[in-house]
Amino acid sequence: MKAALGDVAPEVAFWRPSPERHNLAEVAFHHTFCARSVRGQLSGTTPEPFVLEGQDWFALPGPERLAWPQIHAAVEEEQTKLAALVAELAAGRTLSRLSEAERFNLVLGITCHAVYHAGQIQLLKRLHGA
């Protein structure tokens, strides 16, 4: 995800291949919400409030609601928090009420989710001509 988002300009982030399709900003922000959810499940806590009110998919037609640098920063921050938690769990410094298999499935699931959406982002960049 980090590599896919590294070279994205704001005009590319909010471009849509067609009116009914998600833009790159929405795809990235959706993944951020999902990663936050997984972090909460792994830790057994309620994560801090999300950047925007709502759930899962957020309409981001342009930078009016949230600018691309803020979205990109939110993605980076959530990925960092999730990676740190997974490392803490693996080292035994943080406990989870979930079984090892449940933790594995959540981490594998969100990793596959990131790869899937990173591929979508790469495709959107290619379609845009970026």
Where are the regions that the model predicts?
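Amphipathic alpha-helical packing segments from all-alpha helical-bundle domains
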Residues: 1-4, 78
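Short, contiguous alpha-helical
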Residues: 2, 10-56, 96-130
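Short coil/turn linker and secondary-structure boundary residues
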Residues: 8, 22, 63-66
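Extracellular-facing binding/remodeling surfaces
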Residues: 9-11, 88-89
